[in-house]
Curated annotation (Swiss-Prot):
One Pfam family hit: FSAP_sig_propep
UniProt-listed GO biological process terms: defense response to Gram-negative bacterium; defense response to Gram-positive bacterium
Chain positions found as Isoleucine amide: 60
Signal sequence range: 1-22
Keyword set, alphabetical order: Amidation, Amphibian defense peptide, Antibiotic, Antimicrobial, Cleavage on pair of basic residues, Secreted, Signal
Main location per the UniProt record: secreted
UniProt KW tRNA processing keyword: no
Propeptide residue span(s): 23-45
UniProt function note: Antimicrobial peptide.
Record's protein name: Temporin-1V
Location in the cell: Secreted
Organism of derivation: Odorrana versabilis (Chinese bamboo leaf odorous frog)
Amino acid sequence: MFTLKKSLLLLFFLGTINLSLCEEERDADEEERRDDPDEMNVEVEKRFLPLVGKILSGLIGK
């Protein structure tokens, strides 16, 4: 019983460390993405182009 508790505790500890490292890496990637102006422009274009397409198709269709 004691060895089972030890191994479960070890798995929990390793899983917690792995999860925290993944969160830190994801946060760093998000900060890096926000700081890079080229990628910000690409994100704006991705949001802007479909909107323009819908507006133009609405105007042409009428």
